């Protein structure tokens, strides 16, 4: 984290402090059960952002979601380990789900924290086996489908067509969204129509996965002992003979054209995916779904027409991430932020990328997202208005009246400046003000 970022973005200071505190609490949760404790500690190691997202969910969904995520990450670790021979990896992926009932099964593979995940996988299995039959069935079914889908793509040296690209993203991300929707419904916290609209959950998953694939070009192409190539040849073949040509600085112009083409492809999932939000009713589930989506569109805005994709890592500022977590509390706040980032991408299209041959289609898709957001904002504002003034607004009014009364009292007593204010009065006013801000933003 660059502390100088706060000079340019002071509005991110308080959200960052709140996120740091929430992260501290998360790391220091008192969990007596060793298997459950391992799962949450491992989750925090492999994905701090998703660990925070899970904490937004209702309590009864957190353990299942945590274990579901770790099982799929373990499956993904097998797929990603390029040192495992194909003849070993393919059957391993196809039978991975069968080991969910075996408390002793584990395998050595992966790197970094994933080595620990695979070495201690029996602890994940132990928690999984305690779930009710319905939860276990959902997790096992998605793991089976995902593993078989991954195996189908192992024999392909590269993704050739856009439909293949969509199918791969469905297997590795869309299925996860579909499974989560089933868990939401099975818990009784969401309605059956959420499961009936599988394609909407799938589209949201495709959008997030394509964000990662576009952003991680350099990491994937430099993977040893063999590169991982997920960009479809149907797109990159228009700009190069080999996918790895884009990492060569002399090919940057072509690389940028391909990058913008990839972003434009990812945008086609936005507008459809946004429609699924109308099917979510539980506020905690809604927030857990909203946060990754708004972070996804922000990432897409950052990578669009950005040469740094081919030089290193492009990611959001930590303060910006914190601000999204803190302020994304409702559909209204979500659509306002989503629209803000869509507007930023539109500006990129109209200025720095105006000569890109794909820009007309990019603009069309961005403007479709903008229109969907504006319509949703109007609808959400009407709904919020019908509820009457919020607690935060009432408190803000009360604070204003109290502050005016206090200053009037000090003035009548002969005070002429802040120096005349009793120190305890200043402290009280500031403390109440901070409490009001905290209530308005809601707890992370």
UniProtKB/Swiss-Prot annotation:
EC primary class: transferase
UniProt KW Transmembrane helix keyword: yes
GO cellular component: endoplasmic reticulum membrane
GO molecular function, one term: squalene synthase [NAD(P)H] activity
Topology in membrane: Multi-pass membrane protein
UniProt-listed InterPro entries: Isoprenoid_synthase_dom_sf, Squ/phyt_synthse, Squal_synth-like, Squalene/phytoene_synthase_CS, Trans_IPPS_euk-type, Trans_IPPS_HH
Binding site for Mg(2+): 76, 79-80
Membrane spanning residue stretches: 391-411, 415-435
Cell membrane found in the keyword field: no
Segments forming a coiled coil: none
Subcellular location field: Membrane
Similarity field: Belongs to the phytoene/squalene synthase family.
Role description: Converts the C20 geranylgeranyl diphosphate (GGPP) to the C40 lycopaoctaene, the first committed intermediate in the production of lycopadiene. Converts farnesyl diphosphate (FPP) into squalene, a precursor for sterol biosynthesis in eukaryotes. Converts with low efficiency the C20 phytyl diphosphate (PPP) to the C40 lycopadiene in vitro. This reaction may not have biological significance in vivo.
Name of the molecule in the record: Lycopaoctaene synthase
Species annotation: Botryococcus braunii
Classification of source organism: Eukaryota, Viridiplantae, Chlorophyta, core chlorophytes, Trebouxiophyceae
């Amino acid at each position: 984290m660059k502390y100088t970022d706060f000079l340019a973005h002071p509005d991110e200071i308080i959200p960052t402090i709140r996120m740091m505190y929430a992260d501290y609490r998360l790391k220091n949760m008192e969990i007596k059960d060793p298997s459950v404790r391992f799962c949450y500690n491992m989750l925090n190691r492999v994905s701090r952002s998703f660990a925070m997202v899970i904490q937004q969910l209702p309590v009864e969904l957190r353990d299942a979601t945590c274990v579901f995520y770790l099982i799929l990450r373990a499956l993904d670790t097998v797929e990603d380990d390029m040192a495992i021979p194909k003849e070993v990896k393919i059957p391993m992926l196809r039978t991975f789900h069968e080991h969910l009932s075996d408390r002793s099964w584990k395998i050595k593979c992966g790197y970094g924290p994933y080595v620990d995940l695979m070495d201690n996988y029996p602890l994940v299995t132990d928690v999984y086996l305690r779930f009710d039959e319905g939860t276990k069935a959902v997790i096992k079914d998605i793991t089976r489908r995902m593993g078989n889908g991954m195996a189908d793509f192992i024999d392909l040296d590269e993704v050739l067509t856009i439909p293949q690209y969509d199918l791969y993203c469905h297997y590795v991300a869309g299925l996860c969204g579909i499974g989560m929707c089933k868990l939401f419904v099975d818990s009784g916290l969401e309605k059956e129509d959420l499961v009936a609209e599988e394609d909407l959950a799938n589209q949201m998953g495709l959008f997030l996965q394509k964000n990662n694939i576009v952003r991680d070009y350099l990491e994937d192409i430099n993977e040893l002992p063999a590169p991982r190539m997920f960009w479809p040849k149907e797109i990159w073949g228009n700009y190069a003979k080999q996918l790895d040509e884009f990492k060569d600085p002399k090919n940057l112009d072509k690389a940028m054209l391909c990058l913008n083409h990839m972003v434009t492809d990812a945008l086609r999932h936005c507008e459809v995916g946004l429609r699924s939000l109308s099917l979510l009713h539980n506020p905690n589930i809604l927030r857990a779904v909203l946060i990754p989506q708004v972070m996804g569109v922000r990432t897409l805005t950052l990578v669009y027409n950005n040469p740094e994709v081919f030089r290193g890592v492009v990611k959001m500022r930590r303060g910006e991430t914190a601000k999204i977590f803190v302020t994304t509390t409702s559909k209204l706040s979500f659509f306002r932020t989503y629209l803000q980032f869509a507007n930023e991408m539109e500006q990129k299209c109209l200025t720095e990328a105006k000569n890109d041959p794909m820009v007309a289609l990019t603009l069309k898709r961005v403007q479709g997202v903008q229109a969907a957001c504006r319509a949703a904002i109007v609808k959400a504002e009407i709904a919020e208005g019908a509820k009457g003034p919020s607690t935060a607004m009432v408190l803000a009014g009360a604070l204003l009246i109290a502050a005016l009364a206090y200053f009037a009292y000090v003035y009548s007593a002969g005070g002429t400046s802040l120096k005349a204010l009793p120190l305890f009065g200043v402290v009280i006013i500031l403390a109440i003000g901070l409490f009001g801000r905290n209530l308005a933003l809601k707890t992370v």
